[in-house]
Amino acid sequence: MAQIIDGRGLAEKLQKKLAEKTARLKEKTGQVPGLVVIVVGNNPASQIYVRNKERSALAAGFRSKVERLPEETSQEELLSLIETYNQNPDWHGILVQLPLPEHIDDEAVLLAIDPDKDVDGFHPLNMGKLWSGHPVMIPATPAGIMAMFHEYGIELEGKRAVVIGRSNIVGKPMAQLLLAKNATVTLTHSRTHNLAKTAKRADILVVAIGRGHFVTKNFVKEGAVVIDVGMNRDENGKLIGDVKFDEVAEIASLITPVPGGVGPMTITMLMEQTYQAFKRSLES
């Protein structure tokens, strides 16, 4: 039976350390990190995520602000607000909650955020730095997974890693971070031929395909480490991952649960990157 990776417990531990670091810097400088979250419309899931981010920022000792904009906000109005925060030195991190309403171009919005304040790590400049081996802002979910590997002493060098899912938010940056640790990485997706066969070769399997219970024990080698990034709802409204947890846990060596695995770490890494952006602003 697999050991369960306690993402919630690890996130709380790192959050406590972050609050201590913030308090020390405040004592030295009289300043704290500032994080603004911008949300457009009333998507219920977005509202939950935003509340969690706000709660986490306040727990870390940050100054936190949420800009709640109506659904009909124009793209120009949103870009203008982002530029206001770009120019304000009191705010070190800017998060725009996705998804945005259909009339707003996500890419234009992500491009508008100052790369130095892009704590989501989605700006093309930050993506380029990651791929060139000089990361500054890293997408928070892959960053959280790497922190899990470190905390649990999971060796990556020389290991075969398979990532299922090729999004810019998780799959691609995850593959690059694993490569940087000298893993041999295969990046797969829903159209990969013989996907289960490919996945079954993995020592490290990261699943971010967005399909509930997509990965069964037929995808998993005995003793593999399995990271489930999925967040889906079943027919009863229960939150489930991309991995069929009960059967995969019988053969994996370590596995993340859903909920309580990757999710809490994602928010903690957003806070860590806000802190780092604040530190860089003090040094510049």
From Swiss-Prot:
An annotated Gene Ontology molecular function: methylenetetrahydrofolate dehydrogenase (NADP+) activity
A single BP term in Gene Ontology: methionine biosynthetic process
Catalytic activity: (6R)-5,10-methylene-5,6,7,8-tetrahydrofolate + NADP(+) = (6R)-5,10-methenyltetrahydrofolate + NADPH; (6R)-5,10-methenyltetrahydrofolate + H2O = (6R)-10-formyltetrahydrofolate + H(+)
Positions with a binding annotation for NADP(+): 165-167, 190
Pathway given in the UniProt record: One-carbon metabolism; tetrahydrofolate interconversion
The keyword Chloroplast belongs to this UniProt entry's keyword annotation: no
Keywords: Amino-acid biosynthesis, Histidine biosynthesis, Hydrolase, Methionine biosynthesis, Multifunctional enzyme, NADP, One-carbon metabolism, Oxidoreductase, Purine biosynthesis
Pfam families: THF_DHG_CYH (PF00763), THF_DHG_CYH_C (PF02882)
EC number(s) recorded for this UniProt protein: 1.5.1.5, 3.5.4.9
InterPro entries for the chain: Aminoacid_DH-like_N_sf (IPR046346), NAD(P)-bd_dom_sf (IPR036291), THF_DH/CycHdrlase (IPR000672), THF_DH/CycHdrlase_cat_dom (IPR020630), THF_DH/CycHdrlase_CS (IPR020867), THF_DH/CycHdrlase_NAD-bd_dom (IPR020631)
GO cellular component: cytosol
Summary of subunit composition and partner proteins: Homodimer.
Function, as annotated: Catalyzes the oxidation of 5,10-methylenetetrahydrofolate to 5,10-methenyltetrahydrofolate and then the hydrolysis of 5,10-methenyltetrahydrofolate to 10-formyltetrahydrofolate.
Family of this protein: Belongs to the tetrahydrofolate dehydrogenase/cyclohydrolase family.
Protein name, entry field: Bifunctional protein FolD
Lineage, highest ranks first: Bacteria, Bacillati, Bacillota, Bacilli, Lactobacillales
Gene encoding the protein: folD
